């Protein structure tokens, strides 16, 4: 969950003056001591017990009951992603009627569109990062705020904000955005989420009705997409999920979650198969599934998922390197890749593609380059995923990739949102966040990590 500290500027305001939070900024939540009123035109909308946000044109707030969820006993060298959570919502599952499409994908969904630079991440940069920076670095930070990055729907309480973003995109396009803007979101709320790690355990438990709750979460996303059929929207589906079923099935939580993961993702792919949508399922990275022992079973599994969902036309392919650090291409595989011949993402997708095609799926790919600007990295092992030292912002989002298999470079992981806490006493502490190649001290997953932002900015390649 996100837990922001107020800026120094707010703390210095005169006591007789009521501070107002900027649009998209935080205005409440557990531990929040900053402004609770929004600027004109905004309303403070509660997203969960830990976070409330100023949203334009909002009229009501969403209130949730919350309970503590999620424990695990095993850690592995897998990737993890932003947006852990501890909220749970009891809802009734209902499937909305609406159009679906079947058949083969029809071209690169990024072509002819600009990706959405979401105001939420921009507000983090402007209200959390820049106030403690000066000079040239602050100017560069302002440029980062304009880079498109995905919005993470990592708890059900955030789904209503999807409509706010889609409305914002619609307005931009009606105002003549050229090229038109595409919405970019991450669907990330599986029950028993992140089954082989601790840092990003989610809000739903399989043992507590998690499958039904997840389906209600997907129904709510579908409803938002149906309200905005004119907004082209691209989704990354469930980071750190199916890849665990290849390499970490020996972990009790993963073996116990296998059927639920497959059922839930099947439901998501079918329900979100809409004319204005393109989807990419997360497929780990080359250092995870690129090994000879893993890549064949991975191709078979992903192709089966595609076919079991009735070959949805909106399912374009796979997302790789999400929240990770791998190079797109590197001349020599570094020592920390330990002999893995598919050590970079270009090698990985070109090895995976023919296997997928032979299994019945002519898939394409996108790659997260938000934190891969420094190559080789300072990882001790390619599976080290938590707040790795020495990293930098990487290739900017673009559909100009120079590779027929790669639809786009994207920033899925918002740079400087922590991968996980380094506090060994925390309930969600994962040993990877205490490794010598992890930057410390680090806050909880999803919380703003100022030192990490400054590292990414200083080492950005290309530079800002």
UniProtKB/Swiss-Prot annotation:
Biased composition (Low complexity): 65-100
GO cellular component, one term: extracellular region
Region (Catalytic), start-end ranges: 103-464
Domain notes: Has a modular structure: a carbohydrate-binding module (CBM) at the N-terminus, a linker rich in threonines, and a C-terminal exocellobiohydrolase catalytic module. The genes for catalytic modules and CBMs seem to have evolved separately and have been linked by gene fusion.
SMART domains: fCBD
Signal peptide (residue range): 1-19
Keywords, sorted A to Z: Carbohydrate metabolism, Cellulose degradation, Disulfide bond, Glycosidase, Hydrolase, Polysaccharide degradation, Secreted, Signal
Disulfide bridges in this chain: 27-44, 38-54, 195-254, 386-433
GO molecular function, one term: cellulose 1,4-beta-cellobiosidase activity
PROSITE patterns named among the record's database cross-references: CBM1_1, CBM1_2, GLYCOSYL_HYDROL_F6_1, GLYCOSYL_HYDROL_F6_2
Protein name, entry field: Probable 1,4-beta-D-glucan cellobiohydrolase C
Main subcellular location: secreted
GO terms, biological process: cellulose catabolic process
Organism: Aspergillus clavatus (strain ATCC 1007 / CBS 513.65 / DSM 816 / NCTC 3887 / NRRL 1 / QM 1276 / 107)
InterPro entries in the record: Beta_cellobiohydrolase, Beta_cellobiohydrolase_sf, CBD_sf, Cellulose-bd_dom_fun, Glyco_hydro_6_CS
Localisation per UniProt entry: Secreted
Database matches in Pfam families: CBM_1, Glyco_hydro_6
Catalytic residue positions: 194, 240 (proton donor), 419 (nucleophile)
Region annotated Disordered, chain positions: 65-108
Residues covered by the CBM1 domain: 20-55
């Amino acid at each position: 969950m996100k837990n922001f500290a107020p800026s120094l500027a707010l703390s210095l305001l005169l006591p007789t003056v009521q501070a107002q939070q900027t649009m998209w900024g935080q205005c409440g939540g557990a531990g929040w001591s900053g402004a609770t009123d929004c600027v004109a035109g905004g309303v403070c909308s509660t997203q969960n017990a830990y976070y409330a946000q100023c949203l334009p044109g909002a009229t009501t707030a969403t209130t949730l009951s919350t309970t503590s969820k999620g424990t695990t006993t095993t850690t592995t060298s897998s990737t993890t992603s932003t947006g852990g959570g501890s909220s749970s919502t009891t809802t009734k599952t209902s499937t909305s009627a609406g159009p679906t499409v079947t058949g083969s994908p029809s071209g690169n969904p990024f072509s002819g569109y600009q990706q959405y630079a979401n105001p939420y991440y921009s507000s983090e940069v402007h209200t959390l990062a820049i106030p403690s920076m000066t000079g040239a670095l602050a100017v560069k930070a302002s440029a980062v705020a304009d880079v498109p990055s995905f919005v993470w729907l990592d708890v059900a309480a955030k789904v209503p904000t999807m409509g706010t973003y889609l409305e914002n995109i619609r307005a931009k396009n009606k105002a003549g955005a050229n090229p038109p803007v595409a919405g970019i979101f991450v669907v990330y709320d599986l029950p028993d989420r992140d089954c082989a790690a601790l840092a990003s355990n989610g809000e739903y438990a399989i043992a507590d009705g998690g499958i039904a709750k997840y389906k209600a979460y997907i129904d709510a996303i579908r409803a938002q997409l149906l309200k905005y059929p004119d907004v082209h929207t691209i989704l990354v589906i469930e980071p750190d999920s199916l890849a665990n079923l290849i390499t970490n099935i020996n972990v009790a939580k993963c073996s116990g979650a296998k059927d639920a993961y497959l059922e839930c993702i099947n439901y998501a792919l079918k329900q979100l198969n809409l004319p204005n949508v393109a989807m990419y399922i997360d497929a780990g990275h080359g250092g995870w599934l690129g090994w000879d022992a893993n890549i064949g079973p991975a191709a078979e599994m992903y192709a089966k998922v595609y076919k079991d969902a009735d070959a949805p036309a909106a399912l374009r392919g796979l997302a790789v390197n999400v929240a990770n650090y791998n190079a797109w291409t590197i001349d020599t595989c570094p020592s920390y890749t330990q002999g893995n011949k598919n050590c970079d993402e270009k090698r990985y997708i070109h090895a995976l593609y023919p296997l997928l095609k032979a299994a019945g799926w002519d898939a394409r790919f996108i790659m997260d380059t938000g934190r891969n600007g420094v190559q080789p990295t300072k990882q001790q092992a390619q599976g080290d995923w938590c707040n790795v030292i020495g990293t930098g912002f990487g290739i900017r989002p673009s559909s100009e990739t120079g590779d027929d298999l790669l639809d786009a470079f994207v920033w899925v992981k918002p740079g400087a949102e922590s991968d996980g806490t380094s506090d060994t006493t925390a309930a969600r502490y994962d040993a990877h966040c205490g490794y010598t190649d992890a930057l410390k001290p680090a806050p909880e997953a999803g919380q703003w990590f100022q030192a990490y932002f400054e590292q990414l900015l200083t080492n950005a390649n290309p530079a800002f």
